């Protein structure tokens, strides 16, 4: 690795970690009602509650909190589905795009409501400006805020004693949007517009190329069948292209929240590899920073709200300790180039630049890929399908760990806290003592709920992959034979089953089979995790505080960091290494053998 590349990585991590404390403290003040913005915008909050009929003083039990969360998200799914199906009749559709097909609309609606943002369609070719703004961008805000609300409820479960309520979902949702996501998104959008990210309602523009280009395409008969000559070779015709269509739209406003809310769904088909969505190295840095900044800062928010900031730093340290080594593995694998070249005696001096933008290079592409899959973001500035086998394995495995290495805003931290509960339970088994975490006893009920949280994503990933490779409907979308084709299917279900949204794009996923299967995987992986987390929160809130004793495991020490990292990695390794061995690992071995 070059000194320049190392400097870029250190600069990114330095800024990210430096922002964790101030932003985390601010978010804690927002949720506790201490922030100056809460006082300044109190009239706006009251107006929102009044027109929606919400009593902000009404507290909810965990069941009521979960019901509000589920109903709100279900209404979001229905709204986005209806908007896509009716977009041909609605305004702000300068290209006259027709309604989205039912299966694709179903998949997209669930995808954005669950904070996954899996995209089987091409954004600028499928969705109108209105659908992008009113449907997808709104869901980017509310799905992120929903995850943050669930996290806040879990934190209150640790803080409260002998209580049967966890707060008010509608208040937590409103404050997440009004005081955190909206201001940050507005600031980031302005910075991105300054860098050249487009923000307009104008229709697409046709421009004349400086130099015309041409290509040969197969000729077809009236029935659309390819023509062949007497020898069976395809008959082609030369086509000259002198114009290009430039897709435009309100991209900057959507890009800002798609990054900050760990949503990831791009305005354009190639996401942040598109120059209108990510034109400069500085815009690239800002968008990469936005992927992890809220998730990292929420660790400090957690520490502040539980009254011991060391607890938050321990969680952040565990996340960083997993993230950094895997980042270096990705960078080194991509800089090493295709292993098949080395086996053939070819010197890949420039590394593996396939599928990458030259304006970003290998380090920034690998850093983005690692960050976007450590978080449940899924946006890309390079094509993961073109990474080397081991370079692509790291993003896949980061998703398979459960999106707890930073993870989604809210969902990443509550997932890691579930692993922390498992870690103290394991430690309690070793010393024969009832485990405790933050002064609350961890008993059978909490462990049952934690088991559901940990087991549902692997069930979606491995079960979905197994079904896809057994059925013709699943195999027909694979155009790369062998191990890489299997990797594409495994990556798709790893992404959907962990609410990430990125893809090995060589898989033709916009089919009824994949739209249905991946849609169900996204739905269950989001809500079968959030509801058990709220159940844990309710159980913990009802318990009394247990003062730490001589046998209590300290959870603010480097030893606990190591224990937590070990639990996360062991669970991930035992669950997915056999499947990874059939995909990227065997593909790497085949490339070494140059076969």
From Swiss-Prot:
Gene Ontology cellular component list: plasma membrane
Pfam families with a match to the protein in the record: KdpA (PF03814)
Record's subcellular location: Cell inner membrane
Residue stretches spanning the membrane: 9-29, 63-83, 135-155, 177-197, 285-305, 312-332, 412-432, 451-471, 516-536, 560-580
Primary location: membrane
Cystine pairings recorded for this chain: none
Domain of life: Bacteria
Family matches, as InterPro entries: KdpA
Keywords, in A-Z order: Cell inner membrane, Cell membrane, Ion transport, Membrane, Potassium, Potassium transport, Transmembrane, Transmembrane helix, Transport
GO molecular function: P-type potassium transmembrane transporter activity; potassium ion binding
Record's bilayer topology term: Multi-pass membrane protein
Keyword match Glycoprotein: no
UniProt keyword annotation of Cell inner membrane present: yes
NCBIfam families reported for this sequence: kdpA
PANTHER family: POTASSIUM-TRANSPORTING ATPASE A CHAIN, POTASSIUM-TRANSPORTING ATPASE POTASSIUM-BINDING SUBUNIT
Subunit (UniProt): The system is composed of three essential subunits: KdpA, KdpB and KdpC.
Function description: Part of the high-affinity ATP-driven potassium transport (or Kdp) system, which catalyzes the hydrolysis of ATP coupled with the electrogenic transport of potassium into the cytoplasm. This subunit binds the periplasmic potassium ions and delivers the ions to the membrane domain of KdpB through an intramembrane tunnel.
Family under the similarity heading: Belongs to the KdpA family.
Entry protein name: Potassium-transporting ATPase potassium-binding subunit
Organism from which the protein derives: Methylococcus capsulatus (strain ATCC 33009 / NCIMB 11132 / Bath)
């Amino acid at each position: 690795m070059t000194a320049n590349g190392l400097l870029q990585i250190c600069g990114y991590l330095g800024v990210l970690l430096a922002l964790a404390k101030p932003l985390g403290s601010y978010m804690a003040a927002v949720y506790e009602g201490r922030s100056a913005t809460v006082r300044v915008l109190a009239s706006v909050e009251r107006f929102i509650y009044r027109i929606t009929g919400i009593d902000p003083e009404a507290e909810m039990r965990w069941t009521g909190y979960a019901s509000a969360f589920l109903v709100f998200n279900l209404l979001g799914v229905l709204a986005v589905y209806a908007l896509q199906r009716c977009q041909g009749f609605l305004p702000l559709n300068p290209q006259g795009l027709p309604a989205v097909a039912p299966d694709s609309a179903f998949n997209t609606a669930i995808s954005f409501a669950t904070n996954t943002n899996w995209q089987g369609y091409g954004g600028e070719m499928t969705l109108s400006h209105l659908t992008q703004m009113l449907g997808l961008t709104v869901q980017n805000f509310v799905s992120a805020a929903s995850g943050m609300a669930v996290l806040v409820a879990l934190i209150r479960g640790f803080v409260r004693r002998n209580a049967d309520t966890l707060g008010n979902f509608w208040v937590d949702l409103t404050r997440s949007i009004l005081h955190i996501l909206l201001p940050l998104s507005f600031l980031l959008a302005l910075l991105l517009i300054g860098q050249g990210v487009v923000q307009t309602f104008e229709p697409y523009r046709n421009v004349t190329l400086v130099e015309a280009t041409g290509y040969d395409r197969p000729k077809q008969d009236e029935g659309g069948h390819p023509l062949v000559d007497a020898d069976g070779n395809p008959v082609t015709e030369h086509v000259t292209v002198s114009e290009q269509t430039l897709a435009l739209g309100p991209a900057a406003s959507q890009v800002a929240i798609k990054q900050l809310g760990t949503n990831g769904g791009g305005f354009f088909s190639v996401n942040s590899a598109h120059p209108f969505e990510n034109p400069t190295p500085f815009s690239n840095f800002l968008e990469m920073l936005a992927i992890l900044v809220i998730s990292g800062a929420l660790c400090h928010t957690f520490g502040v709200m539980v009254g011991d900031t060391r607890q938050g730093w321990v969680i952040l340290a565990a996340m960083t300790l997993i993230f950094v080594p895997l980042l270096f593995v990705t960078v080194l694998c991509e800089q090493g180039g295709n292993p098949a070249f080395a086996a053939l005696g070819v010197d890949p001096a420039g590394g593996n630049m396939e599928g990458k933008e030259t304006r970003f290079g290998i380090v920034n592409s690998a850093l983005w890929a690692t960050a976007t899959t450590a978080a449940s973001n899924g946006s890309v500035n390079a094509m993961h399908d073109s990474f080397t086998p081991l370079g692509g394995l790291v993003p896949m495995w980061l998703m398979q760990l459960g999106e707890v290495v930073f993870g989604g805003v809210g969902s990443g931290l509550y997932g890691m806290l579930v692993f922390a509960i498992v870690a103290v339970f394991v430690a309690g088994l070793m010393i024969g003592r009832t485990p405790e975490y933050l002064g609350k006893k961890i008993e059978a009920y909490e462990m049952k709920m934690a088991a559901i949280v940990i087991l549902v994503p692997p069930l979606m990933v491995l079960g979905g992959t197994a079904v896809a490779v057994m059925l013709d409907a699943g195999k027909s979308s694979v155009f790369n034979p062998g191990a890489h084709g299997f990797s594409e299917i495994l990556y798709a279900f790893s992404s959907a089953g962990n609410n990430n949204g990125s893809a090995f794009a060589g898989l033709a996923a916009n089919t009824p089979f994949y739209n249905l299967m991946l849609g169900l995987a996204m739905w269950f992986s989001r809500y079968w995790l959030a509801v058990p987390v709220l159940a844990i929160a309710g159980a913990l809130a009802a318990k009394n505080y247990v003062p730490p004793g001589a046998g209590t495991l300290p959870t603010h020490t480097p030893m606990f960091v190591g224990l937590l990292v070990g639990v996360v990695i062991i669970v991930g390794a035992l669950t997915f290494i056999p499947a990874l061995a059939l995909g990227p690992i065997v593909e790497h071995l085949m490339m070494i053998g140059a076969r």
